[in-house]
């Protein structure tokens, strides 16, 4: 990741998403976005999302995914996978000998495999970043 992210101020207190609370502007600490977003820099890659198949998981077209290749993928995780040399982002389903890639949007079908298909999990999605403005 870029050294541009270095550190920024983070409020020590949380901000309620319900009823407003009194603000305390003097309590801030420094946080490194690099260390917050990336636990293993040598195995972390950023991908830009293209498409709408994962909106139910909060991943939208244009989002930036932080993907860690050093994490062993398990059932239920959102992963970047290759299928016959094509990449996709889906939720990994791995139960009772069945493996498939699940979309998180009912308008898209899950991806199942036949013997001739080559599928591998490329990495595990650890963050999805979206620009609001």
Predicted segments, located by residue:
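Short, positionally conserved secondary-structure boundary motifs
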Residues: 1-55, 86-87, 94, 98, ...
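PDZ-domain C-terminal substructure recognizer with occasional recognition of PDZ-binding tails
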Residues: 88-112
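Short aromatic-glycine motifs in intrinsically disordered, low-complexity regions
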Residues: 81-82, 110-116
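Short, hydrophobic/aromatic-rich segments at coil-to-beta transitions
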Residues: 42-44, 74-79
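Structural motif
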Residues: 62-63, 77
């Amino acid at each position: 990741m870029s050294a541009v992210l270095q550190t920024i101020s983070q409020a020590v207190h949380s901000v309620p998403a319900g009823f407003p609370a009194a603000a305390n502007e003097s309590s801030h600490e420094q946080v490194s976005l690099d260390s917050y977003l990336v636990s293993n820099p040598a195995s972390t890659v950023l991908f830009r999302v293209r498409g709408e198949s994962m909106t139910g998981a909060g991943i939208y077209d244009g989002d930036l995914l932080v993907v860690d290749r050093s994490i062993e993928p398990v059932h239920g995780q959102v992963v970047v996978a290759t299928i016959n040399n094509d990449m996709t982002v889906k939720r990994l389903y791995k139960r009772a000998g069945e493996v498939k890639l699940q979309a998180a949007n009912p308008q898209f079908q899950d991806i199942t495999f036949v013997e001739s298909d080559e599928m591998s999990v490329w990495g595990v999605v650890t963050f999805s970043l979206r620009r609001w403005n």
